[in-house]
Amino acid sequence: MAQKEKDALSGVETTGHEWDGLRELNNPLPKWWLYIFYVCIAWSLVYYVLYPAWPLGKSYTKGLLGYSQREELVQKVADGKKAQEKYLTAIAATSVEDIQKNKDLLAFAMAGGRSYFNENCAACHGAGGQGAKGFPTLADDVWLWGGTTADIYKTIQHGIRADDGDTRGTVGIGMTAFGRDGILNRDQIGQVAEYILSLNKRSTDAAAAEKGKTVYDENCAACHGENAQGSLAVGMEVGAPPLVTGNWLYGGDKATLVQTITNGRAGVMPAWSKRLDDATIKSLAVYVHNLGGGK
């Protein structure tokens, strides 16, 4: 039988290991640590009996309590939907204008609308409705198809030049490609671009801008208005933007204006009624209207 070695100074047995003259003492674990360890073992055994614990092929031990986090989640989701149901039903039965007048419905629609917007609209229009090139800003007061709550609701519901019988605009038809279709020559396009720049006090060629006014009156005023205030200002629903506000969907520099006049533009927005229910669309309309630019 091997002789147990003890440390001469402390009198404690060593483990027999030695590193560079250092020996490891074989002190027992503290009692408080052992007690906690034993309690943990006991608790784990109780847990195994009461709660789901061990996998069994495609199943698992259910435990005496029959607890399931999945079932708890399903129940909580169901409870949440039930709590929302009365508001969703009320919103579906209320016009978008009247939702704005009801404090409780407005608060619910704004909260839901923000979530729906981030999920469905922010990818194009930005998280704050700030827009991007080719996608209009929704947080200002410049609207191509109307900025009332009813207008916004209709736009979201039926889309712009979308595959929907009540879509706004006409599918496949947008701004005329004046250069590509041979309606205006290069000089005329440059002149009308200078005229538009002059309306925004940015023209560098007064003579070309003066000639451009004639070209504009003959070719552009029918949609954009004589004073370039946009189609809504002249009572038309064609989505022609105002050209005097400094808000540009594709860019307001001369090169971009020339490109736009030459090739035309025909923005498209999907009809969300094919994906979202009416209460969701109304909540979105209310939320967008309250981003800051609603009429």
Swiss-Prot record:
Q: Topologically, how does it sit relative to the membrane? A: Single-pass membrane protein
Residues in compartment: Cytoplasmic = 1-31
Q: Which residues lie on this side of the membrane: Periplasmic?
A: 53-295
Q: Which residues bind heme c 2?
A: 175, 220, 223-224
Keyword field = Cell inner membrane, Cell membrane, Electron transport, Heme, Hydrogen ion transport, Ion transport, Iron, Membrane, Metal-binding, Oxidoreductase, Repeat, Respiratory chain, Transmembrane, Transmembrane helix, Transport
Highest taxon, organism lineage: Bacteria
Q: Which residues form a coiled coil?
A: none
Protein family per UniProt:
Belongs to the CcoP / FixP family.
This chain's function reads:
C-type cytochrome. Part of the cbb3-type cytochrome c oxidase complex. CcoP subunit is required for transferring electrons from donor cytochrome c via its heme groups to CcoO subunit. From there, electrons are shuttled to the catalytic binuclear center of CcoN subunit where oxygen reduction takes place. The complex also functions as a proton pump.
Record protein name field: Cbb3-type cytochrome c oxidase subunit CcoP
Source organism (scientific name): Azospirillum brasilense
List the lineage, top down. Bacteria, Pseudomonadati, Pseudomonadota, Alphaproteobacteria, Rhodospirillales
- Gene it is expressed from: ccoP
